[in-house]
């Protein structure tokens, strides 16, 4: 077993399945009597407490002496094995669900590559797709006609445009400058400062966004769900990067850059059906992610109960 002692990952423990040597940043831990997997779970459960014991200085470090003197509960070996078995079973549940999630995500990626490009057509649809410049489908909206009481929205690569109150990080802004912010309506798309990395974001909310963003609104009839998926596809992001070669963090993709890229315009009925399929895939992925998070919380609860003697494990024999 090893415990990493430096930097942001200090305090991280791992059980080695092979014979190995470790560098000076790691402490090698050998269990002379007892269950090594139980020790691993104890260290995992004590992660934050161990980190707080780090040396101070230019770089906070752990050393062998600190780890050696760290006190943990150490029941008899049979109980250790029982507890380790329970937690290992929970780990396997999480691992299996994470593998299923990876498969679902790969399936979604494949569907996007096939359905959003017309490589694979749905039954009942055979009309040729049109390809037109994006500025024939979307226009840039600069609407600052608001009273600044609308909610401030932020761009995220995983959730699209959301209220700033839902973003984990604390983003500062000057309330006196809100009059310069652009109005966004539900169903609009937004080009953010990170769109060259994560595509163009869709807004399910009405609000206002930074003047650094470009707000896009359809000027012809479309299914927003189709373009919500299309603008996040790896194929489109690659094309966007080619069109704006040289742009780096902090620089905006202009509407003119966006508008010159040709995008597909399938029949509206086909747009809807493709969007439904991909939305269903998203829903399945979301449910599985929530299930995995619930299993991780269950494991944390088990560790708190079993590794602190709040609940004892019955041992026969």
Which residues does each predicted region cover?
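Sequence-specific dsDNA recognition surfaces
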Residues: 17, 21-22, 28, 135-186
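Short amphipathic coiled-coil heptad-repeat segments
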Residues: 89-92, 96-132, 290-317
């Amino acid at each position: 077993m090893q415990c990493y002692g430096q930097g942001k990952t200090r305090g991280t423990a791992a059980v080695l399945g092979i014979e190995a040597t470790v560098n000076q940043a790691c402490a090698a831990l050998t269990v002379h009597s007892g269950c090594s997997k139980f020790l691993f779970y104890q260290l995992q459960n004590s992660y934050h407490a161990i980190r707080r014991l780090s040396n101070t200085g230019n770089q906070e470090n752990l050393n062998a002496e600190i780890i050696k003197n760290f006190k943990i509960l150490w029941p008899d070996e049979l109980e250790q094995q029982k507890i380790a078995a329970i937690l290992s079973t929970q780990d396997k549940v999480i691992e299996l669900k994470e593998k299923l999630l990876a498969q679902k995500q790969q399936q979604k990626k494949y569907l996007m590559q096939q359905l959003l490009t017309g490589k694979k057509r749905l039954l009942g649809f055979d009309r040729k797709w049109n390809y037109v410049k994006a500025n024939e489908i979307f226009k840039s909206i600069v609407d600052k006609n608001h009273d600044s009481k609308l909610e401030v929205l932020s761009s995220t690569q995983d959730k699209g445009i959301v209220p700033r109150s839902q973003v984990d990080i604390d983003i500062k802004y000057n309330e006196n400058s809100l009059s310069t912010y652009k109005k966004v309506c539900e169903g609009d798309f937004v080009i953010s400062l990170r769109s060259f990395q994560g595509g163009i974001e869709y807004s399910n909310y009405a609000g206002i966004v930074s003047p650094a963003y470009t707000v896009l609104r359809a000027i012809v009839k479309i299914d927003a769900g189709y373009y919500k998926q299309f603008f996040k596809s790896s194929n489109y992001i690659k094309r966007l990067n080619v069109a704006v070669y040289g742009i780096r963090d902090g620089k905006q993709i202009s509407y003119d850059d966006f508008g010159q890229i040709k995008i597909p315009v399938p029949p509206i009925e086909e747009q809807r059906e493709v969007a439904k399929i991909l939305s269903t895939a998203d829903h399945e992925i979301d449910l599985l992610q929530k299930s995995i998070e619930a299993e991780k919380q269950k494991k944390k609860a088990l560790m708190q109960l079993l590794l602190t003697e709040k609940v004892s494990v019955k041992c026969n024999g």
